[in-house]
Amino acid sequence: TYPKRSYYGGPDYTCQHCRAIFWYHERVQSQSSRQHIVYNVCCRGGKVSLPKHRPSPPPLHELVRFDGGSSSNQFMRLIRQYNSLFAFTSLGVHVDKSINTGNGPYVFRINGVVHHRIGSLIPEPGHRPEYAQLYIYDTANEMQNRLNIVDPDGDALPDPVIVSALIKMLDDVNPLVKKFRMARDRLHSPSAPEVAIKLIGTIDGHGDRYALPSSTELAGLLIGGSSAGVSSFDIVVQSHGSEFKHISPIHPALMALQYPLLFPYGDPGYHTGIKFKQPPTDGRENVSQQEFYVHRMHYRVGEPNPELCSGRLSQQYQVNCYSSVEASKLSFYFFNQDLLRCETYQGISDAMGRGASNGRDVGIKKMLPATHVGSKRYMQQNFHDCMAICRVYGPPDKFTTFTCNPKWLEIIEALRFEPGQRASDRADMVVRVFHMKLDEYLDDIKEGRVFGPVRAVAHTNEFQKRGLPHSHIIVWQSETGHEPSVEDVDKYISAELPDPNIDPLGFSLVQEFMMHGPCGPANPKSPCMKDGKCSKNYPKQFRSETSFDPAGYPLYRRRNNGIVTCKNNIPLDNRWVVPHNLDVLKKYQAHINVEACNQ
């Protein structure tokens, strides 16, 4: 225990409009009081109203559990494979499998552009059925056909009993499956006419103007090659042909087709024309794609949410949703360059002026605005803002990295609603707690509670390879000149293990969060090892006093005082300690590196 420890408790507050769970710190401070707490991240203060999730049908309800038996555990571990057995569409993207080597938590990461495609109802001669074709072709051997698409050399194979039960479940409750089964029956009749399935791309005229349409409106049969009633937004899946149809990120059937185990009832996803319950003041009438997914991905007590609570499949779905939102934004920029005043960036003369003398580089250039996170202009604008601060105040004095700790009590308490769930299953909760802690840490720095009075602060947020967020922060102190001093470094930075007899809490925290390695001969496979040596130059040398090398880099005090800890049964002393601020470490209890800098 530590009296100044940062702690917010569990997410014990709810939005008064949609019942999404929150921490008190996440309130809209300008509109809230202790008696009237306002949240608007989830539903924009009641303006976005969407249907609730329905309970999953059996046996899916019993299988999707984090605290279930052996069948449930095996299903949750292979849930992405099970979903791929029943998906109607292919996920055209490179999935980075190298990230999951080792013993760390599972992470779903993709590279490149996401494409969703659907083929014909009947496979080409000599080809095995796949995706939607499995609902039509050779259904007498359907289970074996589905199992044939699984890599036989994988770590584990889906259970045929579970696959059979899921086939029956989808046949009973999923309207999209029923449409494909109807097409199968038509195609198998002796006098079968040409049959196609229309995936409806526009939905309107559905009862409640605030509710999504019923899933029966997502698909229809076209008999005899008729194209009556087919709009430019619809996708027609023909019975034969080698052409693949791309499905738009805003097609209402997209997610139901790609994730039948998340949406077993075939519920429609985002589509254009979803109205606000209460129109906002900005003049818009329709819910945006981002607002739709933000609403759906908030947990509400007593309401099942497969989009958050399906383990590895939820990870894939959330990445898919984000990529869809990004694709829609990029599409808007592509077709609205005139609104962004981009005419000066187009044309051969402009290309030559920018040095694009190669003919392959000459053509139409599309500009991303500075408001688009990650764009070239976004990065340049923030870089020049920081350089402007440096021109006024000189180089920063302190550099600190604030890293998320997935074992924070707030995260653990947020997982209590789904017993057995782990932090790696809920990236949303991890990031929300991290931002609360980061806001508090930045406030501590700005108010002078960490490094004394400061003149300026700048920071950037990033994500580690495994997905945990962290923030790099640079600080300009008020009480220092342009040259750092030994006294200032020793006042705010320590690179030693505290004495366990005098400060047992400090010793325990440094031991847990601030010890590098072990690496070197004791662990040559450590991630920091490059060309046979540690890229971070550990272990450091013992030093009785802090000093600076000729280039101005600090050489922290690391006394040979006999204080040692063990990590992986390897003794580590002060030479392995990562520089830190002990008071900050005690308050936030995470990996928080602090360095002195002067250039």
Where are these regions (language model features)?
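Non-catalytic interaction regions
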Residues: T1-Q599
